[in-house]
């Protein structure tokens, strides 16, 4: 097989951008219009607040079909609009030729200048939810302004409506349609500004990558000059005068605001206080600035340089806070975000990391809500010498399991990172639960980090994941969730595509559009769940990745996106995609059920055993796509039921359906089984019907790869190794089946799993 030439992907992208630009330039030569002339007095004096509500919606062309010339011509003929009003306003004030003749930095300054000139007080408002609220003042005003007109409209059409409705509901529907369109446009505009600001002002990329952007811009400038010269027969002097961009009067007036990059950063990220987190080492050393790990670990007895802890915030520096923070980040390590309720899990996790011989530093991100006594418990678990081992250790050690560390397990380098002061006081109450994982991805001080939950169970050492081929290739490695047939509207995917970069973003600022690499994933086709965020691998220093982290945090505030997801899960990879960053990889397998196979005699009360094998477990496990068997990690702790301490066992014994071997047992036996370590002998990655349809059959085999059960506070899921069967009642009927992945582990692997489970629960 012939290997692709290095840089081929970049070359293809450059060619696509040049072709797209050439189409636009052909359009310029064919259609002449005065409204884009930058010296036109009307354009100079004309200002539009693109955030101002409007009830008319011109046809919008997304320009996403490979910059198709026919689409551009049709759009132009019908008074076309760009996907984002940010560009619509820019090209009302300036000709396309004059803008494309600018350098990259000039384009950045012009666009920001143009945005602020339309609304001097522009700021991204985290308090704006974009939610439809029928009790709001806005809705009352809408009724006052539009009520009479809508009443007349309703009287005309009410008898022809497919579904009968009241006037009140009709007005609500009309309000929802209008506001939804407005909110959608406003979100598109805000995300466009966010991407452009990050691309222009947040350091991102190596010199080679920046040189590539410069070459693209230079090629565009050559095409602009050539196209205009050929179309108009103008001299070089005439052409130079034409292409010279002139600022509007409003743009001239906001020079000071545009040149103040620190203030610009505060406009885009007002929820960030511009203060660094507070870093506290296990030994009591503290820092108001990201610690330099190379310096600290070089000589533990050498005092640290005082100047690194003297800077309280970034306002003493003219540069943008986020650039300072990115530049100060260093090293690689493990990151987790916890509160007081996660302390026990964190202690168990640290014991597990010691058993895995982890030597990477650990940053525990918190929001001013961990007590000193809890810190002391964590430090004790991380630092005290371990002399006792579970009985299962001997069996594993003598079995020559290579992953078991020598005795004693190494102490852990634990840091506590308080991010409370890094969030503006007026916005602190906007963050809750899963949001802190997104903040942890931003405010940890590592260049490379593994973000995990307190109840994440690693079955490989952390270094294994940093060395994984998928992570090494992309600097962003993710894992898929379970794949039950829980669906979402197809319109969710269509909405997300609109939120991504358009071709004009790509032409103007080299921000790539979404491709089928993203849009062909199951979430865009209607699957409810896609990513499991219990373990996330990201390298901040890779091109665009830091900006993608910023995007995923910003998406949290955009409720039409965040509220359609399950917690934080999907915001990680969608933050990448919406940022124009598809340099990420997923493990190919969806999550597995891990544990022990259900015995045939207990399966569905059938006389004939099912072909499909079953595992009922509360733990989503992740099987390597490199060998289709290695268990890499799983979630929900190492007890059989992570909710063991929160269950009414009297009720559990009465309502038990799937764990029939426990029927008739005393509730205390139930509790012991739930509290003991999960024993793993098998794993099942269920099949997924590509049409997301159940496979009904006459064999009474499972129709779906997953079923949810009430056990373990409804955290229990049963997985099946195959689905489908006979499509008719006759024995000879055609069979439609799908097989998943069934893994049976060796005695050595099972012994190793048992050892790690005993370590995690503290079974010594």
Curated annotation (Swiss-Prot):
Cytoplasmic side: 1-13
Topological domains, Lumenal: 35-764
SUPFAM superfamilies cross-referenced by the UniProt entry: Nucleotide-diphospho-sugar transferases
Predominant subcellular localization, coarse grouping: Golgi
Pathway it works in: Protein modification; protein glycosylation
Role, per record: Responsible for addition of the terminal mannose residues to the outer chain of core N-linked polysaccharides and to O-linked mannotriose. Implicated in late Golgi modifications.
Keywords recorded for this protein, A-Z: Glycoprotein, Glycosyltransferase, Golgi apparatus, Membrane, Signal-anchor, Transferase, Transmembrane, Transmembrane helix
Protein name stated in the entry: Putative alpha-1,3-mannosyltransferase MNN13
Keyword Hydrolase: no
Recorded superkingdom: Eukaryota
Organism of origin: Candida albicans (strain SC5314 / ATCC MYA-2876) (Yeast)
Molecular function terms, GO-annotated: alpha-1,3-mannosyltransferase activity
A GO term from the CC aspect: Golgi apparatus
Subcellular location: Golgi apparatus membrane
EC number: 2.4.1.-
């Amino acid at each position: 097989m012939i290997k692709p030439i290095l840089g081929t992907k970049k070359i293809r992208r450059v060619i696509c951008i040049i072709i797209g630009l050439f189409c636009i330039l052909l359009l310029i030569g064919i259609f002449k219009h005065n409204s884009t002339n930058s010296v036109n007095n009307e354009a100079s004096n004309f200002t539009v607040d693109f955030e101002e509500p409007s009830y008319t919606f011109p046809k919008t062309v997304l320009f996403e079909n490979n910059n198709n010339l026919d689409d551009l011509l049709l759009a132009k003929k019908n008074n076309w609009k760009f996907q984002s009003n940010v560009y619509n306003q820019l090209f009302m004030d300036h000709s396309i030729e004059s803008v494309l003749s600018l350098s990259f930095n000039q384009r950045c300054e012009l666009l920001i200048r143009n945005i602020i000139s339309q609304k001097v007080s522009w700021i991204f408002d985290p308090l704006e939810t974009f939610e439809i609220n029928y009790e709001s003042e806005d809705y009352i005003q809408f009724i006052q302004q539009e009520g009479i007109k809508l009443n007349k409209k309703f009287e005309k059409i009410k008898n022809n409506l497919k579904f009968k409705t009241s006037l009140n509901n009709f007005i609500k529907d009309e309000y929802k349609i209008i506001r939804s369109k407005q909110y959608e446009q406003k979100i598109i505009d805000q995300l466009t500004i966010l991407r452009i600001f990050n691309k222009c002002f947040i350091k991102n990329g190596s010199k080679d990558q920046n040189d590539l952007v410069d070459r693209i811009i230079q090629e565009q400038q050559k095409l602009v000059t050539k196209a205009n010269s050929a179309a108009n027969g103008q001299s070089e002097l005439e052409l130079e005068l034409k292409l010279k961009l002139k600022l509007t009067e409003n743009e001239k007036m906001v020079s000071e605001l545009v040149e103040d990059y620190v203030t610009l950063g505060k406009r885009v990220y007002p929820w960030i206080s511009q203060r660094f987190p507070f870093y506290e080492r296990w030994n009591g050393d503290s820092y108001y600035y990201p610690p330099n790990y190379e310096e600290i670990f070089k000589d533990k007895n050498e005092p640290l340089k005082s100047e690194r802890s003297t800077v309280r915030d970034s306002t003493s520096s003219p540069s943008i806070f986020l650039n300072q923070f990115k530049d100060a980040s260093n090293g690689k390590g493990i990151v987790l975000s916890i509160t007081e309720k996660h302390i026990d899990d964190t202690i168990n996790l640290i014991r597990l990391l010691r058993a895995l011989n982890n030597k990477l530093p650990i940053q525990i991100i918190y929001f001013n809500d961990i007590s000193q006594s809890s810190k002391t418990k964590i430090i004790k678990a991380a630092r005290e010498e371990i002399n006792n081992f579970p009985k299962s250790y001997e069996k594993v050690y003598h079995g020559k399991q290579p992953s078991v560390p020598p005795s004693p397990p190494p102490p852990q380098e634990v840091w506590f990172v308080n991010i409370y002061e890094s969030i503006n006081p007026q916005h602190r109450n906007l963050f809750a639960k899963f949001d802190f994982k997104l903040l942890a991805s931003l405010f940890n001080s590592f260049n490379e980090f593994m973000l995990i939950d307190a109840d994440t169970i690693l079955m490989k050492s952390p270094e294994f994941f940093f060395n994984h081929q998928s992570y090494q290739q992309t600097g962003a490695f993710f894992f898929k969730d379970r794949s039950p047939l829980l669906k979402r509207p197809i319109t969710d995917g269509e909405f997300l595509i609109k939120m991504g970069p358009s071709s004009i973003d790509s032409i103007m600022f080299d921000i790539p559009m979404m491709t089928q690499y993203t849009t062909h994933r199951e979430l865009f086709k209607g699957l409810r769940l896609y990513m499991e965020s219990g373990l996330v691998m990201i390298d901040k220093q890779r091109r665009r990745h830091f900006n993608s982290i910023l995007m995923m945090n910003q998406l949290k505030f955009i409720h039409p996106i965040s509220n359609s997801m399950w917690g934080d899960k999907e915001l990680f990879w969608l933050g990448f995609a919406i940022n124009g960053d598809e340099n990420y990889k997923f493990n190919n397998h969806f999550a597995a059920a891990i544990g022990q196979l259900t015995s045939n005699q207990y399966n569905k009360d059938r006389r004939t055993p099912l072909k499909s094998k079953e595992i009922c477990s509360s733990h989503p496990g992740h099987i390597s796509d490199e060998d289709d068997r290695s268990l890499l990690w799983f979630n929900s702790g190492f007890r059989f039921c992570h909710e063991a301490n929160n269950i009414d066992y009297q009720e559990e014994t009465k309502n038990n359906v799937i764990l029939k071997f426990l029927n008739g047992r005393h509730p205390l036996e139930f509790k012991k089984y739930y509290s003991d370590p999960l024993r793993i002998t098998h794993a099942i990655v269920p099949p997924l019907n590509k049409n997301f349809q159940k496979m009904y059959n006459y064999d009474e085999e499972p129709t779906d790869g997953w079923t949810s059960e009430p056990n373990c506070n409804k955290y229990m899921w049963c997985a099946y190794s195959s689905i489908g069967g006979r499509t008719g009642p006759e024995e000879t009927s055609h069979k439609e089946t799908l097989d998943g992945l069934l893994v049976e582990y060796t005695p050595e692997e099972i012994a190793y799993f048992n050892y790690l489970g005993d370590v995690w629960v503290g079974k010594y």
